[in-house]
């Protein structure tokens, strides 16, 4: 094996494998999430997840008139990419003093995420908006059976899944902050190939963060953004 590309949900989950790669002189390129800060990783290629949260905060704040109550429905609390999205969102939303983040719910901290989200909707009948910070949570929220009084809640999601694209077309979701999986994969493989070159012949930038894009009804059919749309 001459090089390894890895993605970790939780940064500590690959520690032993990273140590083994280092001992055997195998360069490691991390992509997407999980091990960006490890000294055992030669390079990282992935989305700027802090920016994902910031864009979501700006778009949600704008959509609800820069005032009101919002909730964050999140995935694994220990996942680095999710941590960055949540912190990006909560830090940016402080620019709007009339907006209150009333709840942050993590899927790995509850027994039933659908029930937990419904509990938030029931607890805050005047909730104005929600940020679903990954594709699975967004799709789960869209699948929930909600009464008509909840139709006015503004939703912003992450990654333009087929279900979220349909929700945007049907005005059930204001928009989605989407990653570009092709660019992420291309950058990762290209960087892995560069690690096989003589050390002094190429310069490999340690961290490359790929900007996400905002997708809504105004640009979802624009071919320019087709690489940000997911088939499933």
What is each stretch, according to the model?
Residues 2-23, 28, 89, 102, ...:
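Hydrophobic alpha-helical
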Residues 3, 8, 42-43, 69-77:
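Short beta-strand segments enriched in small/hydrophobic residues
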Residues 12-51, 69, 161-174:
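Flexible loop/hinge segments that line or gate small-molecule binding clefts
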Residues 40-47, 76-79, 102-105, 126-128, ...:
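Second-shell loop/turn segments in exported
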Residues 45-70, 113-114, 160-164, 180-200:
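Hydrophobic alpha-helical segments within soluble ligand-binding/sensing domains
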Residues 52-59, 80-100, 116, 140, ...:
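Short, solvent-exposed amphipathic alpha-helices that sit
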Residues 69-74, 90-110:
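Short beta-strand elements in bilobed, periplasmic/extracellular small-molecule ligand-binding domains
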Residues 92-96, 186-232:
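Hinge/cleft segment of the Venus flytrap/periplasmic-binding protein
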């Amino acid at each position: 094996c001459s090089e390894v590309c890895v993605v970790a949900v939780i940064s500590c989950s690959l520690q032993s494998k990273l140590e083994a790669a280092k001992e055997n002189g195998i360069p490691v390129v991390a992509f997407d999430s999980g091990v960006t800060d490890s000294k055992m990783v030669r390079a990282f290629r992935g989305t700027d997840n802090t920016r994902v949260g910031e864009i979501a905060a700006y778009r949600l704040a704008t959509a609800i008139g820069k005032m009101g109550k919002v909730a964050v429905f999140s995935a694994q609390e220990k996942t680095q990419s999710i941590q960055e999205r949540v912190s990006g969102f909560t830090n940016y939303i402080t620019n709007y003093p009339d907006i209150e983040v009333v709840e942050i719910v993590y899927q790995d901290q509850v027994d039933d995420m659908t029930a937990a989200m419904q509990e938030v909707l029931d607890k805050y009948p005047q909730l104005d908006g929600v940020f679903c910070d990954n594709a699975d949570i967004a799709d789960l929220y869209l699948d929930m059976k909600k009464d008509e009084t909840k139709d006015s809640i503004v939703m912003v999601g992450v990654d333009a899944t087929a279900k979220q694209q349909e929700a945007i077309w049907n005005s059930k979701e204001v928009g989605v902050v989407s990653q570009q999986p092709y660019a992420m994969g291309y950058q990762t493989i290209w960087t892995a190939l560069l690690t096989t070159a003589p050390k002094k012949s190429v310069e490999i930038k340690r961290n490359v963060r790929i900007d996400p894009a905002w997708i809504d009804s105004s640009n979802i059919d624009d071919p320019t953004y087709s690489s940000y749309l997911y088939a499933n």
